[in-house]
Amino acid sequence: IDEIGILAISTRLQRLSEQLRKDGALIYKSFDIDFEPKWFPVIYRLHIKEMLSVVEIANEIGYSHPSTISLLKELEKQKIISSKKDKADERKRLIVLTAKGKELVVKMQPVWTIMKKTLNELTDNQNNLLKAIEETEQKLER
């Protein structure tokens, strides 16, 4: 795959993503935190914004509506989030972190600091990976 170059970019990014998720899961496990890395974008957004609708979460994390629903069901089953109907629009579900979800965030914050430092070191090189990804995403949006 590596010799194919640009034609394999999707495969290489997927491989990198899978490795980062796997390593992230091992880090959480080493801190005795029962957490799936795929839950991170939802948990983090709710930690910052406190209450969001399903559509707002999907838009903010960049997932499709069905993928977001599936992820939310998983988190609800784990009792990390709960949902309630919006009083102004009963078709809309509002999502919040439960007490268990908030405790989880408190437990994870020191780990996020470590992960952020490590990821910054990993991507801060001659061709900054994060900047390159952001530039590519912007080009794709045009």
Where are these regions (language model features)?
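N-terminal positioning helix adjacent to the helix-turn-helix/winged-helix DNA-binding module
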Residues: 5, 9, 38-39, 100, ...
